[in-house]
Amino acid sequence: MNNLERLRQENPLVVCYTNDVVKNFTANGLLSIGASPAMSEAPEEAKEFYKVAGALLINIGTMTKANEQDILEIGKIANQQGTPIVFDPVAVGASSYRKAFCQKFLSEVKVSVIKGNASEILTLVDATTTMKGTDGKTDLDVVEIAKRAHEELNTAIVLTGKDDVVVQGGKVVKLSNGSPLLAKITGAGCLLGGIVASFLFREENPTLQVLEEAVSIYNIAAEIAEKDQQVNGPGTFLPKLLDQMYNIDFNTYQQQVKRQEVE
C-alpha cells in the first residue's frame, strides 16, 4: 500500500492550529485529500486530541500576544504525546516580533518538519533577513538555504517556491511540479503544511519519500486543475484544486512527478 492509499484508508486526524484567513480552505483541502481535520486550539483539550492525531500543524499567520502561550503549550503537549509537528513560520521575516517568537518556539518545542518559502526558512537561521509580508524573495541558493536550516535546526525542511526543496536525513530533492495559480489564492501554502501533516502518520522522523510525495501530489493536483477547460482564473481554479486533490491517484503521481536528487 502506498502512502496516498494509506492516508485515504486510515483517514488520519490532523489537528490544525492555523491562521484565521485559511481555516476553511485548509479544512476542505484536508477533507479532499482524505484526512480528517480538527481546528482545535485549546490547550485544555490538546492531550486528548493528540493521543489519536496523526500530526499537528502549527501556523503562526495571524498570531497575537494573546495566543503565544497557547502555541507554546500545545507544542509541548504534542511533544509529550509523541505527535509530530509541522511548523509553518508564516512571514517570520516581516517583523522582529515574529522572529523572536519563532526563535523561542523552536528552542522549546521539537518539530518534525518546518515548511516555508526561502525567505522564511532563511530568517530562521539568519536573523538579519527581512521580507515583505508573506511573499518574501531572496536571490540566495534555495538548496543551500534548505540544507543549512536542516543542519542547524535538526529537522526536515520543506522549502517552497518555483521549485520546492525537501531536505531530510542529509538528503536533498528538488521538486518542480505546481501551478502559478497557487500564488493567486490565499492559503495555498498554508494548506500544503496541512497536506504534509496528513502524510506523517504519527512518525516524528518522517522519511524523505513521504515528504516529497505529500508535496508533489498536492502540486500535481494543482497542475491538473489549472488545465481544466472551466478554469480561467483563481476563482475557478480553487474548487477545481479541491476536486483534483480528491481524484488524484498514486499512478498519476508516479507518471507526472518532476524530481531531481541534489548533492
Swiss-Prot record:
It catalyses: 5-(2-hydroxyethyl)-4-methylthiazole + ATP = 4-methyl-5-(2-phosphooxyethyl)-thiazole + ADP + H(+). The keyword Zinc-finger does not apply. Substrate binds at M39, G187. The keyword Kinase applies. It is an enzyme of class 2 (transferase). Pathway: Cofactor biosynthesis; thiamine diphosphate biosynthesis; 4-methyl-5-(2-phosphoethyl)-thiazole from 5-(2-hydroxyethyl)-4-methylthiazole: step 1/1. GO terms for molecular function: ATP binding; hydroxyethylthiazole kinase activity; magnesium ion binding. Belongs to the Thz kinase family. This is Hydroxyethylthiazole kinase. It comes from Staphylococcus haemolyticus (strain JCSC1435).
